[in-house]
Regions:
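Acidic, mature catalytic/reactive cores of soluble proteins
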Residues: 1-218
Length: 218
């Protein structure tokens, strides 16, 4: 039984990697990178920013965040890479995931969600854990879900455009997505001049970031 499961696993991953385009140079490196993105994907289409929590940006310092969530920005870039290289199914699942997380009122949109679409991602510090190389605090949850990051929707809208340009759906699918796109556009037009936290997720006051203005233009 164990050997059969092993063979099935091999067949699955060989079939998955065979769907991608072949490259004359760096093919092995590209393949390993795609496998990493795939391993960070959930069956419902969500893509995690990382599989880890509380690994410090610098050992001994306090910027130790929980990245085990689906950021619209990060996930859109990951899915666009998979899509352009031959994995349309990943993009299709992600489109369904984001539609399941969005609601009609545009002011409730978030920059990130839990892997099952959870909206409340309250950050908690685990004082009883010492952290990686004594880098405290150790956190679960991420309060960045409250933040405004004006670049996020630009990445998502670019992915939606790329997807429907190459994969036209049914009329019902397109109409459902169009309702969401219109609502996103309303949010962007209202917020793009407003200071925000940017992709750096600063925890102080909001600022004006050029990257966010550019993504608003997108």
């Amino acid at each position: 039984r164990g050997n059969l499961d092993y063979v099935r696993t091999l067949v699955y991953w060989f079939n998955w990697t065979d769907r991608k385009r072949k490259f004359t140079i760096y093919n092995d490196i590209i393949e390993r990178s795609l496998l990493t993105l795939k391993m960070m994907s959930f069956y419902n289409g969500a893509v995690l920013a990382s599989l880890t929590t509380s690994l410090p940006e610098a050992v001994g310092e306090v910027r130790n965040w929980d990245y085990r969530f689906c950021w619209l920005r990060d996930a859109s870039m990951s899915i666009e890479t998979l899509f352009k290289i031959g994995h349309a199914d990943a993009a299709r699942k992600f489109m369904k995931f984001i539609q399941s997380t969005f609601v009609a009122e545009h002011d409730t949109y978030q920059i990130m969600y839990g892997i099952r679409g959870e909206r409340k991602l309250t950050e908690v510090i685990l004082d009883h854990l010492s952290g990686y190389k004594n880098s405290q605090p150790v956190r679960i949850g991420n309060d960045a879900y409250h933040q405004r990051q004006n670049d996020s929707f630009g990445y998502l809208m670019d992915l939606i455009y790329q997807y429907y340009r190459l994969m036209p759906g049914t009329l019902d699918e397109i109409e459902d997505m169009w309702e969401m796109v219109k609502s996103i556009m309303t949010t962007v037009m209202e917020d793009w001049r407003t200071p925000d936290k940017g992709s750096w997720e600063i925890r102080g006051g909001g600022q004006h970031f050029v990257s966010c203005k550019v993504r608003g233009w997108v």
